[in-house]
Amino acid sequence: MNKILIFASSVLFLILSSSFFIVKEGERGIVLQFGKVLRNNELKTVVYNPGLHFKWPFLETVKMLDARIHTMDNQADRFVTKEKKDLIVDSYIKWRINDFSRYYLATGGGDVFQAEVLLKRKFSDRLRSEIGRLNVKEIVTDSRGRLTTDVLNSLNKGSMNLEKSSLINVNSMNALGIHVVDVRIKQINLPVEVSDAIYNRMRAEREAVARSQRSQGQEKAEKLRASADYKVSIILSEARKEALIIKGQGEAEVTKLFAKNFNKEPDFYFFIRSLRAYENSFKNNRNIMLIDSDSQFFRYIKNMINIKNL
């Protein structure tokens, strides 16, 4: 009897534990009955909010789905602009589930990886289409906000305006039970080969500017040097002129003094002049002079010889 009671209690406990389930905060639960999504009388999917809930044991199973916002980083990819120029765009998407039944069916059982594969594919197509309508300047400046807004709207609504329609556009993320919350572009870069070409062109332009600046500097230096040389030549010329004037004035003063003293002491004047003449004449021992011995030139030498012989 005790064994039967224990067995019955165990079965009852198993049934009761299988009859209740808890949905955690940040999750939503959907019940599958024989593998199919459980719907209410209005044929809408029954979604269980956080809390304790009942289900039929063994007949129904519960699938928990993450109701929080997901962030999906996209690998940097190459896109072509309206000008047929390549850009490397790095971006990310924030999304959440807005239709748990459709999401469960579209992703093969609520697989997040499968959902993001489908989302990346649609996002890449929409971003490629939007970038193809813009030029580089519009993308990297004031059009970035409009670009991401257009991509966001096209992902949520598709290519058709269904605001007044109850149908789900198969081109929108609603077909996957997903709502895209935000789209952001992290970086926009040029391809490596384009960046290298631009860098080389900029370097060539800078080198050309540097050569031009150096050439202009050398030209200015030559002009300054020529101007300085000209000023120096003028200063030297003025100095020589002034020196010659001073020298002439000095010689004139000397001549004037000699003339004045000559009148007073003519013999002394002739004596000094003769000494200077002797000095200039006999500087070089190789000089040969043919002069009459009775010439006045040798008068003082003769006097010195006569004085010596006395």
UniProtKB/Swiss-Prot annotation:
Which UniProt keywords are given for this protein, alphabetically ordered? Membrane, Transmembrane, Transmembrane helix
Tell me which GO cellular component terms the UniProt record holds.
membrane
User: Superkingdom of this entry's organism?
Assistant: Bacteria
Pfam family example for this protein?
Answer: Band_7
List where the protein spans the membrane: 3-23
Q: Where in the cell is it found?
A: Membrane
Membrane-related topology note = Single-pass membrane protein
PANTHER family on file: MODULATOR OF FTSH PROTEASE HFLC
What NCBIfam families does the record tag this protein with? hflC (TIGR01932)
Sum up the protein's function in the record's words: HflC and HflK could regulate a protease.
Record text on subunit structure and interactions: HflC and HflK may interact to form a multimeric complex.
Record family assignment = Belongs to the band 7/mec-2 family. HflC subfamily.
Protein name per Swiss-Prot or TrEMBL: Protein HflC
Native source organism of the sequence: Buchnera aphidicola subsp. Acyrthosiphon pisum (strain APS)
